[in-house]
Regions:
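Divalent-metal (often Zn2+) His-rich catalytic cores of metallo-beta-lactamase-fold enzymes
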Residues: 344-357
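Small/polar glycine-rich anion-binding or flexible loop at a beta-alpha turn
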Residues: 298-302, 335-343
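Active-site beta-strand/loop microenvironment that shapes enzyme catalytic pockets
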Residues: 52-56, 64-66, 71-75, 268-318
Length: 368
């Protein structure tokens, strides 16, 4: 893969880590290039006080921002996540030199902290190969978050069905359970131009976490039709078909697009949740699955993915499918998404919530 390195200032620790990481990329056959020359990722060397934004022109260019911080920072997680948002990054890698660390480069006492948009936050001792192994799979992943709309939703579904009513009710319950983190206050740290840039690039009209879906068999639209909450909405306020909840009738994997059936009065800015690719794979592969819930919470003893793939990528969807196949009953189970949350399947939303009520841990377990 081709990549670019962007830097405006000098920081000995950060730049030493960057040199080691660039060399590791070169050792593995990657090529340093320029942003206009078909790159797949950018190493953005910046700082938390004056963060630099690299404005990508495509979804599948991944931004890895490198910063440093003192071990005396009171809330390192908040600092890193704010920097992640302000730099529009896929990952922030923050180096924290330990006491006695080398003043002009990374030492064996330097810790690196990884922060992702899914609220992942974990750390490990600095090692170029280990950092490379955490980042490169992300750079090689592929978003599948597009939507292709058809005005073919049967009229009997223009108003919420019993299945949509269940999604509405359980969206409210998720909100009460506290497993839908509050959206990051983007306007406190980003210009309106940057916010609109994010929304345009990732086809969003807001930021939110978690999602619900439930199967509703509509034979004239396809064999695996299901309702799913829309992208960026308040899950506690699901009400309108074509705006808050959308009917997915299939997926075009070549184009990376969910095939969405809508009523005539749909919101043209509405988009189904970025996890639609994962849910569609589940419904198509396991006919017994009637509902899927994704929450930023944890359950003890679940199988877990080994790589932090971004939400909405084919690679994350395939990782979840591989885990489901390893469980005793893929149609009624829960699997973990590393440093992210859970995907929970069941024959119905009623069944899922009866199983998880009182068992969810609201703090996601972080793993390096």
């Amino acid at each position: 893969m081709k990549f670019a390195v962007i830097r405006e200032d000098i920081n000995p620790v950060r730049d030493g880590i960057a040199r080691a990481l660039v060399q590791k990329c070169l050792d593995h056959g990657h090529e340093v290039s320029t942003p206009e020359n078909g790159i797949r990722f950018v190493l953005n060397l910046t700082d938390s006080e004056h963060p630099r934004i690299f404005r990508r022109n495509a979804q599948n260019i991944f931004i890895f921002s490198l910063i440093t911080a003192s071990s005396s920072v009171k809330d390192l997680r908040a600092l890193c996540y704010t920097t992640l948002v302000r730099t529009l990054s896929n990952v922030v890698v923050c180096a924290v030199p330990g006491n006695g660390g080398a003043p002009f480069g990374p030492s064996d006492r330097t810790e690196v902290y990884f922060t992702t948009p899914e609220a992942g936050f974990y750390h490990l001792a600095f090692d170029p190969e280990t950092v490379y192994e955490r980042l490169i799979p992300i750079a090689g992943s592929h978003f599948a978050i597009g939507n292709a709309f058809s005005l073919d939703l049967p009229q009997r579904y223009w108003e919420p069905s019993a299945v949509v009513d269940k999604i509405r009710d359980y969206g409210r319950e998720l909100d009460r359970l506290g497993v839908l983190p509050a959206p990051f206050p983007l306007r406190e740290v980003l210009s309106e131009e940057s916010i609109q840039d994010i929304y345009r690039l990732f086809e969003m009209k807001g930021l939110s976490y978690g999602n619900l879906s439930a199967r509703e068999r509509i034979p004239e639209l396809g064999p695996a039709t299901f309702w799913m909450t829309a992208r960026g909405i308040n899950k506690a306020k699901v009400s309108k078909v074509g705006r808050d909840v959308l009917l997915v009738k299939g997926f075009d994997y070549y184009k990376g697009q969910a095939l969405v059936s809508v009523p005539p009065d749909h919101d043209p800015k509405a988009r189904v949740s970025v996890d639609a690719v994962e849910h569609e794979l589940i419904y198509r592969t396991f006919p017994e699955v009637g509902a899927v819930v994704h929450v930023h919470a944890w359950l003890d003893g679940v199988l877990c993915t080994t790589q932090n793939f971004p939400c909405g990528t084919i690679e994350l969807a395939e990782s979840v499918m591989n885990l489901l196949r390893q469980t005793d009953d893929p149609s009624r189970t829960a699997v973990g998404l590393k440093n992210h949350g859970l995907t929970i399947t069941g024959p119905s939303l009623d069944d899922i919530f009866n199983r998880i009520r009182g068992r969810l841990r609201t703090e996601v377990e972080m793993m390096s």
